A protein has these predicted regions:
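Bacterial lipoprotein signal-peptidase II cleavage site
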Residues: 19-33
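Short, polar/charged alpha-helical segment
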Residues: 47-57, 67-88
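Extracytoplasmic ligand-binding site segments that recognize negatively charged/polar headgroups
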Residues: 63-79, 90-106, 112-248
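A ligand-binding cleft/hinge motif common to bilobed small-molecule-binding domains
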Residues: 123-127, 245, 249-269
Length: 347
């Protein structure tokens, strides 16, 4: 990625955004062979991948949360994991936010329903490390140093660039200020609430950059959305694939891999990335330190960071997202070059 903000939600910023209107039965962790997977920090530490697979299969279940099947190819990823290991996946709140993920970790703590793993925005990851347990996947060295917590509390997984997706009926957008035109009345939406959803927050940050703001303050981004609202162009509807197909949200701020015509299912969908506001960002994986299925949680991470043709890294790539191990995969030849060639170009 050319650039990436490490964002933290300040209380003042969150309040400002709201003002704009953008708004028990657990596993013990032990397994055959004596490993306590609830505390193991690597597969090798617990006896290797064979032991991890056996322990995860014995648990038989994995709890995930906030993973929409159409988001970054997660539908295929979830199916591939179950097909490979025969482990049942319980998927909760598929359209939930990063903040809802950590809230579930807290409220479901000590129960069999607690999330085993999380996929959260960086602001939420950095603010909640006390909820995570360290684990380093087998391909740890292929994850850039700046994109992981040194002990393995979190590690970035996939990313992209913030973009504006829009119906071609509006013509061609060349600047965010074009969105202030009367023809965009009630059309411009975010993918969630920026006080809790990472994608929506980064949409505001992109506007902040385009308006000349700096990473240290989102005031200019908030001001832009105030102008959108004053013009009657901002829609409070949280954009989804369904709202895009229905024409309810014909202009959407979202990650480029979630703004592709193939993703939204609209053939006349166009994508605009402001060249004065190129904002890249990654999500991050983490394991709940109270995971009810600790071995399955670790096996899931191993699968996601696998560079095999049918592993998580190439499956994310097939969904239009940029996997965190992309550079290493290009070097060792494991990357799917066809899918890599489809990624939107950013200058």
């Amino acid at each position: 990625m050319r650039s990436s903000y490490r964002l933290a939600l300040a209380g003042v910023a969150a309040a400002a955004l709201l003002a704009v209107g953008c708004s028990s039965s657990g596993s013990s962790g032990s397994s055959s062979g004596g490993a306590n997977w609830a505390t193991e920090t690597s597969a090798s530490g617990g006896g290797g991948m064979t032991a991890l697979v056996a322990a995860a299969k014995k648990e038989g279940t994995l709890n995930v949360i906030a993973l929409p099947p159409t988001w970054a190819n997660y539908g295929a990823i979830l199916s591939a994991f179950t097909a490979k290991y025969g482990i049942k996946i319980n998927s909760a709140l598929p359209d939930g936010s990063s903040q809802q993920e950590v809230q579930a970790v807290k409220t479901e703590h000590g129960t069999a329903k607690a999330p085993d793993v999380l996929d959260v925005g960086m602001a939420v990851a950095l603010a909640n490390t006390t909820l995570f347990t360290p684990y380093q996947v087998s391909s740890w060295s292929d994850i850039p140093t700046a994109q992981k917590e040194p002990t393995g509390l979190w590690y970035q997984d996939y990313g992209g660039y913030m973009a504006v997706g829009y119906s071609s009926k509006f013509g061609t957008i060349t600047s965010l200020n074009d969105l202030l035109s009367p023809k965009f009345k009630g059309a411009v939406a975010l993918n969630g609430n920026p006080t809790s959803a990472n994608a929506a927050l980064n949409g505001v940050m992109m506007a902040n950059l385009a308006e000349g703001g700096s990473p240290g303050s989102i005031a200019d981004g908030v001001a832009f959305f105030k102008k959108l609202k004053a013009a009657g162009n901002f829609s409070p509807v949280q954009a989804t694939g369904a709202t895009i197909k229905a024409g309810t949200t014909p202009v959407v701020f979202n990650w480029d891999y979630l703004n592709l015509p193939s993703y939204v299912g609209v053939s006349n969908w166009k994508v605009f990335i402001p060249q004065n506001a190129v904002l890249g960002g990654y999500y991050a994986q983490a394991i709940n330190k109270g995971a009810p299925h600790p071995a399955a949680a670790r096996l899931w991470e191993e699968f996601l960071y696998s560079q095999a043709a049918s592993g998580g890294q190439n499956l994310w790539l097939a969904g239009g997202a940029r996997p965190v191990e992309q550079a290493a995969m290009q070097t060792n030849g494991s990357i799917n070059t066809t899918d890599a060639g489809k990624l939107p170009s950013v200058s």
